[in-house]
């Protein structure tokens, strides 16, 4: 993989998309200061990993497109979303927010989702499975 910088990766996008992407990157870096940021050119996104013991775990991404940019979460299906603000509910795992410009980026809304996404990613597979099973059993209780 090339060592493409996020700035270089985002440069071709329209100003509002690029600016929104930079704001989203800043939110992730503030909320998860030890996040490892890397451009994934094949996936057309900037991905984030969090250190988890002797490994690192993928937890989210900033994915620009010509008319909008997504802030997405790898284990989004496990995130609490009582107000149903996350998109991607028809997807298996990932959930996301969509922005058309920098003024739509609200750190106070996003920070809890970013923080929890990093925490979930750092769990072991067994711990995540236990969460799924707990939620399934809670939803089946009368």
Region roles according to the model:
Residues 1-142:
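Charge-dense, helix-prone N-terminal extensions
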């Amino acid at each position: 993989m090339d060592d493409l910088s996020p700035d270089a990766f985002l440069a071709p996008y329209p100003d509002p998309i690029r600016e929104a992407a930079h704001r989203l990157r800043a939110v992730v870096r503030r909320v998860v200061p030890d996040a490892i940021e890397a451009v994934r050119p094949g996936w057309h996104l900037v991905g984030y990993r969090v250190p988890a013991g002797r490994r690192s775990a993928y937890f989210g991404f900033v994915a620009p497109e010509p008319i909008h940019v997504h802030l997405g979460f790898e284990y989004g299906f496990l995130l609490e979303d009582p107000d149903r603000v996350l998109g991607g509910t028809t997807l298996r795992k990932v959930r996301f927010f969509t922005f058309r410009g920098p003024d739509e980026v609200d750190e106070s809304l996003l920070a809890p989702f970013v923080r929890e996404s990093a925490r979930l990613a750092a769990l072991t597979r067994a711990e995540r499975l236990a969460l799924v099973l707990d939620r399934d059993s809670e939803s089946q209780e009368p």
